[in-house]
Amino acid sequence: MGTGFHGTTILSIRKDDKVVMIGDGQVTMGNAVVVKSTAQKVKRLSNGKIISGFAGSTADAFTLFERLESKLEAHPGQLLRACVELAKDWRTDKFLRRLEAMMIVADARGTLILNGAGDVIEPEDSVAAIGSGGNYALAAAKALIVHASDLDAFQIAEAAMKIAAKICVFTNENFTVEVIDCASKECS
């Protein structure tokens, strides 16, 4: 992966009336140096109604957050449409095409994965994960959903991320968590 900044794990779980997005805090330069262990890679957008997490270059991710915010302002309450419009720009714009990042975005109604190839993917099983530890977190979360059904969305997300952090050297346990509670006014 060269000497650029990389490495992260973002996981989103949708269970019962909650959507949980969790991300680790590690920023790594190259394959050998941790330059920050408390980065915030999960944030709220659109006046708190949408949660998003990114993997990849931090500067690129902030550019994408800004672009997504403008698409959400142009298409209020339409997460899918805003994401499709962002994906179109991402794929066709000379500058954006060079951005190296992936995002998971979620609102009360759905969860989407966006990537630089212009894909907008709705994950199966209400679980999505990206980043270097994404496959580990995804597998752990799916196993916990099936075999530990008494756990809530937050408990599943936290346990799955702890497993990913033990396996992926680019993921740590300094988690940032955002939750959408669909049983509250937050989803109105």
Swiss-Prot record:
Its EC number is 3.4.25.2. It catalyses: ATP-dependent cleavage of peptide bonds with broad specificity. PROSITE patterns: PROTEASOME_BETA_2. The active site is at 8. SUPFAM superfamilies: N-terminal nucleophile aminohydrolases (Ntn hydrolases). It is an enzyme of class 3 (hydrolase). InterPro entries: ATP-dep_Prtase_HsIV_su, Ntn_hydrolases_N, Proteasome_sua/b, Proteasome_suB-type. Keywords: Allosteric enzyme, Cytoplasm, Hydrolase, Metal-binding, Protease, Sodium, Stress response, Threonine protease. One of its GO terms (biological process) is proteolysis involved in protein catabolic process. It comes from the Bacteria. Na(+) binds at residues 165, 168, 171. GO terms for cellular component: HslUV protease complex; proteasome core complex. One of its GO terms (molecular function) is threonine-type endopeptidase activity. Allosterically activated by HslU binding. A double ring-shaped homohexamer of HslV is capped on each side by a ring-shaped HslU homohexamer. The assembly of the HslU/HslV complex is dependent on binding of ATP. Belongs to the peptidase T1B family. HslV subfamily. This is ATP-dependent protease subunit HslV. It comes from Neorickettsia sennetsu (strain ATCC VR-367 / Miyayama). The gene is hslV.
